Swiss-Prot record:
Ca(2+) binds at D58, D60, D62, N64, D69. Disulfide bonds: none annotated. This is Myosin regulatory light chain 1. It holds the Pfam family EF-hand_7. One of its GO terms (cellular component) is nucleus. It is found in: Cytoplasm. Binds to myosin II chains myo2 and myo3. It comes from the Eukaryota. This chain binds calcium. It comes from Schizosaccharomyces pombe (strain 972 / ATCC 24843) (Fission yeast).
Amino acid sequence: MFSSKENSLGAKRAPFSSNTTSSQRVAAQAAKRASSGAFAQLTSSQIQELKEAFALLDKDGDGNIGREDVKTMLTSLNQDASEDSINHMFESINPPINLAAFLTAMGSMLCRISPRNDLLEAFSTFDDTQSGKIPISTMRDALSSMGDRMDPQEVESILRSYTSHGVFYYEKFVDAIAGSKDSN
């Protein structure tokens, strides 16, 4: 069926030497489970976006992101593509990086980001008084003319439940979609 050095998916297992203690094996397996747990936290849309990003980075189409892929990407973005810069990018993971390793690494990184704080910060740029409220006209304009533009029906469906007296209560909206501040 599969060799003892491969799992059921055909992925290579890290061989343990005869000097490896059982506690070292358990620690290594726990670390592996923790990192794959980050991958499990990704939504299907995040996975799809990350797959698309992976495909863009995999310039030669070999199913792996290597040093040359990163160098090509950095050069095309007019960024520092020196060996030092590339080495820095690969400090925590060894190239080449396959899709599973990329998703796990990105999942781990995304888990450390606080979506609640990021959303509050984004909304606060429209809140001159830092009151947790934004004039509804400002929100309509921003949602229909900036970034991923929304049509009027989409704008109204988002704003409807969090609007009163001509203002959008963005803190309540953020609490609803990213969890309240008490849960973070």
